[in-house]
Amino acid sequence: MTDEKTAMLPVVAPDHKLAAEDSRNRRMRTTRKPVSRKADDGNICVQIVLPVVLTLVILTVVMMLPFLLNIKSTLAVAGTLSLYTQRYKPEFSNHELKKILLNTPSNDSAAEWLRYYTSGAHLAGQNYSQAAWTRDRWAEWGAVSHITAYDLYLNAPADHSLALLKASGDNSDAEEIKWEVDFRASLVEDVIPEDPTTGLKESVPTFHGYSASGNVTGPVVYVNYGTYQDYADLEKANISLKGAVALARYGGIFRGLKVKRAQELGAVGVLLYSDPGDDNGVTEANGYKPYPDGPARHPTSVQRGSVQFLSIAPGDPTTPGYPSKPGVPRGPTDRYIPSIPSIPISYEDALPILKALNGHGPTSKDFGHWWTRNEGLGHKGVDYNIGPTPADKVQVNLYNEQTYTTTPIWNVLGIFNGSVLPNEVVVVGNHRDAWIAGGAVDPNSGSAVVNEVVRSFGVAAAQGWKPLRTIVFASWDGEEYGLLGSTEWVEEYLPWLKHASLAYINIDTGVGGPHFGSSAVPLLHDLVYKVTSEVPSPNQTVPGQTVRDTWSGKIGPLGSGSDYTAFLDHAGITSVDVRFSGGGGGGDGEDAAAAAASGEKTADDVDPVYMYHSNYDSYHWMEKYGDPGFVYHKTMAQVLGLLVAHLATDLVVPFKAGDYADALHTYVDKIRSQLDKHDKEEAAALATGSYSDEAMAEIRGRKKTVDTFDANSIDDAEGQRQFRLAIDRLYSAVSELATKATALDAKADGLREKVGKGHHGHHDALSHGHEHNKDEEISPTLVFAPKWWRRLVRRVHRIWLAFQVAHVNKRYQYLERKFLYEGGLDEREWFKHVIFAPGVWTGYSGAVFPGLVESIDAGNWTNAVRWAGIIEERLLAAAKGLH
């Protein structure tokens, strides 16, 4: 093993010029006559200079002791200080890299990549040709590219049917009811001549990933969005789902959780449809024409998708927690995927069934505003009765046949190796697989954007550029079934990722409209604001506006539903997701209706309806409605490229720990205020429907409603006292973290000033130019010192800076890991993060303090105190880690 002192020698050893000068001095000393005064000078040098040097060395070692404890990582960064300007050509300052990343992305190139990806079916495990094509393109652009495979348990549709049955004639005296088919659903989407994707022979049938096979018949019950509280409303009204087929509308929560709760309540099958009432007023009822003639939803559009229980665990349901490689043991799946059949249908196919419910059971109006707020088929004769339909008169038959096999999927990885810090890694991911032949928005707009970013970095690499840190680009397979490719990869490389990964950047539905959006952990909020301020907006109302200027600035928490899940919730890696999206319609539904009433019935002033996971998510839709001219694809590539560049090339990691502490204070304050106010204001907001759809869905998706937080509901006075004390301790822990975070951010800001802001094109403080000015920065009197002394001090100063940078960077890098609890969340131990996780009954939306809030929702105050303690311990560990 190399001695640590020896390993440091290349960093502090004198350069060849200083060595030559010393050699000349030695030769001169050996040829000169001894003079008593020279001898005296030598004694003075020994008596004065040597102690000073030794003192400086001792002080330096003492100051570096905290960093020497982490010697491997700090030595790596120390090397950057002497190598940084030598390995980076002057023309490749970060300012020049930025110019390449802004100027290289092309509208036409993005369109070309999107056309390729959407030219044929590419279901998970059925897209090797696209994987190979992606690998080859990335390799052409300079990335070291390869394909990794996993063996996944997947289903594919074999057959399905749906029929509305009505009793024939008078069956009052019959021993067995005779049924006749009143309506048979088509279960297909119309072919549109001007949209070639819809007519492809390899078009994927409508089905649910991980749905169960079955042939079931039963009465129908309308369950609204199928949230936990929707089902609770039915239970309160004594409406049973036992033996029934649940009819739910898409929206609000993850589809698999709609099926999960129906299964728990005894339903034999589930039908899911997209109600146009959720299209923000861009509907036929409001005068908009359906696609392709207008921006409204096509009546036959069907949302495919997975019904895996995503909030329990993503990934292969037979190998939870470990990679699904050939030959590994496989377990039962009942905990992770449904045991009852389900199919997705269009609203055109749902109409006869909804009408068959008319007059049976209560109506949605009897259940409050949440049930009636977005009903879009009233003009078609639907009364939105709940049912059930009379079992002796009206039933539905649902037949679903799925074929399950274990089959390979293929991730593509493209790597730009770091030149100085190769073991610090930034991962950038987009999934490639789609439910349909198209997938223009989801996911292949993101695929096209990533290609443009890889191509842009390739342009820089061809001119000699190399990143400071390693960049790994990933094209995931199997995301649509349950985040399979990314989850299996994270599970396989978990130890390495926990050590090396700095951040994960996700782009899924990269472009679906003109509105920028982001979800991220608070560490990255500042960077998102910074990058969006550097990119021109395509939607400028004032010349010179940036993406940041035209964006609300709201950054949401990360839940689940895309490939960041394994990185953040399982591995504790700082993560961010970025996108341009549509509003689903015209923004606010009332605004869209008003525009239609005034005769403005085109897509010009409203956001066209994006028909998610349908055949109409096509290149033609993107070209005509989603992003005409592909201007937002180019802008998204610029944003993504700069995000990657800052993370991969900024010497001081561009994180802000103080933003995390501020967010945590907000989260704890919310719990405290809810305890104090008993949520009366929230209850009123729910009753009047003044919450946004997103907020309403989050609340309705929880196991209990607003009275959950009413401290008066704690019967045990001691339990109430203990819980309040636990929350107070939690707040104190956040305050301690905030103090340390503020100090770390201040130190990082100071270091950025010292090493130079490379993204502005300046050389860093390690450059060998302008040394006179640098000497003044180190010490005003250093400019008067001998040359050899200045060189020595500068070298020591650079080493000291190196250790400080390493110290700060490592604390930022590992902060997110401190929030992992190895025991995992209750009954879903795969999720380790104590701050963020998908809501157990929402799936998509991010839950804050999930273990704590779920305990409160369950009314288990003892467990709530336990979780408050776990979170407190993790926060204190994080605070200690920032010191």
Residues covered by each model-derived region:
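Short, low-complexity, Lys/Arg-enriched N-terminal segments of secretory-pathway carbohydrate enzymes
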Residues: M1-C45
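N-terminal hydrophobic or amphipathic helices/low-complexity stretches enriched
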Residues: I44-L54, T60-S129, D136, R335-P341, ...
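Noncatalytic luminal/extracellular "stalk/propeptide" segments of secretory-pathway proteins
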Residues: L83-E96, N107, E112-L241, P299-L310
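Extracellular/luminal Protease-associated
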Residues: D190-P326, R330-D334, P341, D442, ...
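Soluble metallo-hydrolase cores and metallopeptidase-like ectodomains found primarily
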Residues: G199-D233, A313-G439, R455, V459-Q463
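Metal-dependent peptidase/peptidase-like ectodomains
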Residues: P299-G361, W476-E623, G629, H633, ...
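Alpha-helical metal-binding/catalytic segments enriched in His/Glu/Asp
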Residues: V412, V428, R432-L483, E488, ...
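C-terminal amphipathic alpha-helical interaction region
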Residues: S779-H797, L801-H883
